[in-house]
Amino acid sequence: MGTFTNGDVVTVHDFDGYPMGKGFINQNSKIRIRMLTRHADQEINENFLRMRVKNAWEYRKTTVDTSSCRVIFGEADFLPGLVVDKYEDVLVVECLALGMEQFKETIVSLLKGVLKEDGISIRGVYERSDANERRKEGLPKVKGFIGETFDTEVEITENGVHYLVDVVNGQKTGFFLDQKYNRLAMQRICKGKRVLDCFTHMGTFALNAGICLLYTSDAADE
């Protein structure tokens, strides 16, 4: 089997010895190996990481409004354990895998370069690696600026609604970007209705209901 240190990139073989790809290994994790590539001969270096970042961004450009979106989504982009959300000109990073720790700042730098090629300048990067899942990887919680400090309240617009996102104190990376199309659906189904948005974090569903000329809306956080 060979020797390794938790977090190393290793080649994965099947029972017959056939190479299946490469990934991070961590004996302390319930996910023993997180796959980076299915090509065992592929070098995991800066060129590889840039390709992954570039592919992720190009895909987002063809599928979503990129003003605020999840640019890198872990395993879905073959960058396991890493999430990067873009809020206008701010990036928020969440790293949940030991193996990705060694590459996260390089990936952020590469992503800023890829965005710059499209005329997008990033004014700041904040890390929100403060989820409990980090402990399962043998990692401490981390929360703070990557690089220079900046104003961490970011104004975004989604589905015609304006929000002020607090990337330091907001839940997850500051905002639930994955609920975008559910919020948009509220504008259609709530027209002319009375709406109560219960157990809300930012009142986003109530705001989207309110944009469609409903009779009344209210929101409660508990």
Each predicted region: which residue ranges?
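Conserved class I S-adenosyl-L-methionine
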Residues: 193-199
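Conserved small/polar residues in nucleotide/adenosyl-binding loops
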Residues: 215-221
